[in-house]
C-alpha cells in the first residue's frame, strides 16, 4: 500500500495513532500560538480598543476557518478511504475537484468579509470605541481569505494521505513569519489591530507557498492530471461528507459569535477579558481537536479496509489519550487561569474577567476528550449527518439558550456564561454514546 508509517490498518493502535496525532497537535499548537501572539502583542503594545478588535475580529475569522476545515474533512476522509480500499487512482480527481470548489468558496468569502466588514462588526456588537478597528481587522484578514482556504484544503490533503508531519513544517514557517510581522508592525510601527491582521495574512500566504512546494516534491501514490481540475463526480462525494460537518460547525461557531455578542454588551473590559480567555481556550482544546482530526483519517482507512473492530478500538484509545491530558489541562486552567490570562495583558480588570470565564469553561477540557474522539470516529465512518444533528442539538438547544439566559441576569457572571460550553458537551456525549450503541446493534442485526 504505502509505507508502514502511513498504513493505519495494521500494527499497534496506540503508537500509530499517537505518532500520527503528534504532528497534527504540533501544527495546531503553532496555529494557536500565532493567533495568541496577535492578542499578546496588541495587548502589550496596542490599545484596549485594539485588543477588543482583535478579540471580536478573530471570532469572525475563526468561524470561517473552522467551517472551511470541516468542509475539507470530506477531502481527508475520501482520500483515506480510497487508500484503504487500494483505489488511489481516484485521488487525483478528488484533489482537482476540491481545488475548484474551494476556489469558488474563497471568492464568495472574499466579497462578504471585505465589503461587509463594518456590518459584520456591528452585528457582533463590537464596542463603539473598537468598531472601526474591528472592521479594519476583518477587512484585512478577509483580503487574504484565499490563503486561509488554500491552507486548509492542502492540510486536509496531507492528512488524508496519512502525512501529518508536512503540515507541521509549513505551519512552523508561518508562525515565525507572523511573530516577526506582529513585532514589526504592532510593536514597531504601532499599527495596532491592523498590523496584527496584515501579519496574519502574510503568514498564511507563506504557509500556502511552503505547502505547495512540499506537495510538488512529495512522492505520491497517484497521479494528478490537468483534466482533474474541474467539477467532477468526486466533488459530490466529498461534499456529501463535508457539508453536514461544515453546516454543523457554522452553527456552532455562530453560537460562539452570539456568545461574543452577549459578552460585548457587558462592556469593554468584559469583551477584552473574554477575548483573552478565548485564546487560552484555543490552547486548551488542542489535544481534543488533534484527536478528532487524526481519528477521522485513522478510522476511514480501517473502514475502507474492512477493519471495523480496529476502527472502534482506535476510538477508545483516543478517548483514553484525551482524558489523561484533559485532566491535566483542567487542573492548569482551574488553578492558574489568572496567571495564564496575565500573559496577554497587564490590565487587572481584563485578567479578572478572563479568569471568571475560564472557571466556568474549565470542565470542557475533560468532556471534549470523549466527545471529539467519538466525533472523529463517526466522521471517519461516514456518519457525518449524525455528527451534524448532534452538534445542532448541542448548539441550538443547550449552549445558546443557556449563554443568553446567563448573560441577561442582573450582574451577569462570565463564569456562568462559560459553563454553557461543558453543559452542552455533556449532552453531546450522552447523544453520541446512545447513537454508538444503536449503530452497533443495527450492524450486528444486519450482518446476522
Regions found by a protein language model. Give the residues of each.
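Transmembrane alpha-helix boundary and packing residues in multipass membrane permease domains
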Residues: 24, 28, 40, 77, ...
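Short runs within selected transmembrane alpha-helices of multi-pass transporters and secretion channels
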Residues: 72, 141-159, 167-175, 196-209, ...
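N-terminal transmembrane alpha-helices
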Residues: 8-40, 44-45, 59-74, 78, ...
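Short alpha-helical transmembrane segments in multi-pass integral membrane proteins
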Residues: 1-21, 79-146, 188-243, 299-364, ...
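Helix-terminus/linker motif at the lipid-water interface of multi-pass membrane proteins
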Residues: 29, 33-52, 121-128, 184-191, ...
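Hydrophobic transmembrane alpha-helices of multi-pass small-molecule transporters
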Residues: 63-66, 178-183, 207-212, 283-286, ...
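Transmembrane helical elements of multi-pass membrane transporters/channels
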Residues: 19-38, 140, 174, 203-207, ...
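Small-residue-rich hydrophobic transmembrane alpha-helices
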Residues: 51-111, 148-167, 273-337, 368-390
Amino acid at each position: 500500500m504505502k509505507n508502514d508509517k502511513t498504513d493505519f490498518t495494521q500494527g499497534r493502535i496506540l503508537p500509530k495513532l499517537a505518532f500520527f496525532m503528534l504532528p497534527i497537535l504540533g501544527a495546531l499548537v503553532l496555529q494557536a500560538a500565532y493567533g495568541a501572539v496577535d492578542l499578546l502583542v496588541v495587548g502589550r503594545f496596542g490599545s484596549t480598543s485594539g485588543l477588543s478588535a482583535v478579540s471580536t475580529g478573530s471570532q469572525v475569522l475563526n468561524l470561517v476557518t473552522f467551517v472551511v476545515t470541516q468542509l475539507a474533512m470530506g477531502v481527508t476522509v475520501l482520500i483515506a478511504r480510497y487508500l484503504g480500499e487500494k483505489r488511489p487512482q481516484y485521488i487525483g480527481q478528488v484533489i482537482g475537484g476540491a481545488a475548484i470548489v474551494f476556489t469558488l468558496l474563497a471568492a464568495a468569502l472574499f466579497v462578504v468579509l471585505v465589503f461587509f466588514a463594518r456590518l459584520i462588526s456591528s452585528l457582533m456588537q463590537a464596542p463603539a470605541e473598537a468598531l472601526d478597528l474591528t472592521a479594519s481587522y476583518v477587512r484585512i484578514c478577509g483580503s487574504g481569505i484565499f490563503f486561509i482556504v488554500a491552507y486548509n484544503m492542502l492540510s486536509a490533503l496531507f492528512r488524508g494521505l496519512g502525512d501529518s508531519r508536512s503540515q507541521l513544517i509549513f505551519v512552523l514557517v508561518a508562525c515565525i513569519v507572523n511573530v516577526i510581522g506582529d513585532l514589526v508592525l504592532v510593536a514597531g510601527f504601532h499599527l495596532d489591530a491592523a498590523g496584527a491582521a496584515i501579519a496574519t495574512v502574510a503568514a498564511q500566504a507563506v504557509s500556502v507557498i511552503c505547502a505547495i512546494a512540499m506537495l510538488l516534491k512529495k512522492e505520491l501514490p497517484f497521479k494528478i492530471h490537468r483534466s482533474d481540475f474541474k467539477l467532477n463526480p468526486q466533488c459530490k462525494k466529498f461534499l456529501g461528507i463535508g457539508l453536514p460537518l461544515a453546516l454543523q460547525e457554522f452553527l456552532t461557531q455562530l453560537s460562539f459569535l452570539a456568545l461574543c455578542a452577549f459578552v460585548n454588551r457587558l462592556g469593554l473590559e468584559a469583551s477584552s477579558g473574554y477575548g483573552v480567555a478565548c485564546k487560552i481556550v484555543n490552547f486548551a482544546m488542542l489535544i481534543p481537536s488533534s484527536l478528532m482530526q487524526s481519528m477521522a483519517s485513522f478510522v476511514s482507512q480501517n473502514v475502507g479496509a474492512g477493519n471495523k473492530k480496529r476502527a472502534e478500538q482506535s476510538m477508545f484509545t483516543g478517548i483514553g489519550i484525551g482524558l489523561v491530558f484533559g485532566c491535566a489541562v483542567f487542573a492548569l486552567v482551574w488553578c492558574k487561569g489568572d496567571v495564564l490570562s496575565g500573559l496577554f495583558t497587564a490590565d487587572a480588570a481584563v485578567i479578572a474577567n478572563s479568569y471568571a470565564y475560564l472557571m466556568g469553561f474549565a470542565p470542557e477540557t475533560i468532556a471534549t476528550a470523549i466527545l471529539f474522539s467519538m466525533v472523529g470516529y463517526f466522521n471517519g465512518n461516514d456518519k457525518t449527518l449524525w455528527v451534524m444533528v448532534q452538534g445542532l442539538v448541542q448548539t441550538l438547544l443547550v449552549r445558546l439558550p443557556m449563554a443568553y439566559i446567563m448573560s441577561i441576569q442582573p450582574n451577569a457572571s462570565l463564569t456562568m456564561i462559560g459553563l454553557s460550553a461543558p453543559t452542552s458537551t455533556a449532552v453531546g456525549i450522552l447523544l453520541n454514546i446512545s447513537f454508538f450503541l444503536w449503530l452497533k446493534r443495527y450492524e450486528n442485526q444486519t450482518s446476522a
